[in-house]
Amino acid sequence: MKQTKTKYGKMKQMVSNLKLPDYRYEQLTKAIFHQRIDNFDDIHILPKALRMSLVNEFGKNVSSVIPVFSQDSKQARKLLFELTDGERIEAVGLKYKQGWESFCISSQCGCGFGCRFCATGSAGFKRNLTADEITDQLLYFYFNNHRLNSISFMGMGEAFANPELFDAVKILTDQNLFGLSQRRITISTIGIIPGIQRLTKKFPQVNLAFSLHSPFESQRSDLMPINKRFPLNEVMKTLDEHIIHTGRRVFIAYIMLEGINDSKEHAEAVVGLLKNRGSWEHLYHIDLIPYNSTDKTTFKFQSSSAIKQFCSTLKKAGISATVRTQFGSEISAACGQLCYENEL
């Protein structure tokens, strides 16, 4: 049953059901991932009976997501995809000067966790994406001649709240499919402890990013209600265990909100949170993120000088920290801005 859950498992089963040799499945996946063929009818190396069965089961195209709107800036491209049931999600492609291409994909339609500073949460939660819908976002970019150099689960939704996440990562790292290294994938979380623990066991080399945004339990609970279920102190213990087990760095995202979490007291509390945790504490890295304004929230953008001062306080205390370079904010494609705006 598990084998046939995703489209690739179903394709393999289809080859078997038609009593075709196993190499036909290999030909199919090579046509998709080596030759970038998106139309089943165009995979002429396959027998007509198999091509017809594929079209009947999946439709004409390999990728099931349909782009209905796109918006471009100098280094970012935001796409609004429509799914087969009419729901919509957004994904973002980023291109760096060196030619490196990175893609930010969604794991849910909307989000139900209600982080106060995030536009996605204002849309509410509609449903989880399937593993195929998650990976098909990348297939679209791939079929349009983009290089999938790195992937981040930082689009719409909380990745660890979707049980299909790990099937999607399995597809992405399958050497016969996308063939991505685990280290090219980053999963961002607001602190879902069971999800972090499962990642540690199943995909220890996948990068992990944790959304902190306040070092104080009470304020974090106000900004991010999930903190009431998974308190910061417990999340940090889980992150310690992740680092000890994997030897991998954990990235801690901290959105700078003017007058909310940007004080010297906050910076010193972040230092206190990360210092004296153990011999592994150097593997925590703070990623300071300038707030991206939206019409869904009332928070204000923090000045660059204040952010630099906050960063300086962290560095002087021996904390690894950088200020994130933002791309795509002018087209509402940056952190916290994805919210179906273009479907209205």
UniProtKB/Swiss-Prot annotation:
InterPro entries: Aldolase_TIM, Methyltransferase_A, rRNA_lsu_MeTfrase_Cfr, rRNA_lsu_MTrfase_RlmN/Cfr, rSAM. [4Fe-4S] cluster binds at residues 111, 115, 118. One of its GO terms (cellular component) is cytoplasm. It holds the Pfam family Radical_SAM. GO terms for biological process: response to antibiotic; rRNA base methylation; tRNA methylation. Its EC number is 2.1.1.224. Binds 1 [4Fe-4S] cluster. The cluster is coordinated with 3 cysteines and an exchangeable S-adenosyl-L-methionine. It catalyses: adenosine(2503) in 23S rRNA + 2 reduced [2Fe-2S]-[ferredoxin] + 2 S-adenosyl-L-methionine = 8-methyladenosine(2503) in 23S rRNA + 5'-deoxyadenosine + L-methionine + 2 oxidized [2Fe-2S]-[ferredoxin] + S-adenosyl-L-homocysteine. S-adenosyl-L-methionine binds at residues 157-158, 188, 211-213, 292. Belongs to the radical SAM superfamily. RlmN family. Cfr subfamily. Reaction proceeds by a ping-pong mechanism involving intermediate methylation of a conserved cysteine residue. This is Ribosomal RNA large subunit methyltransferase Cfr. The gene is cfr.
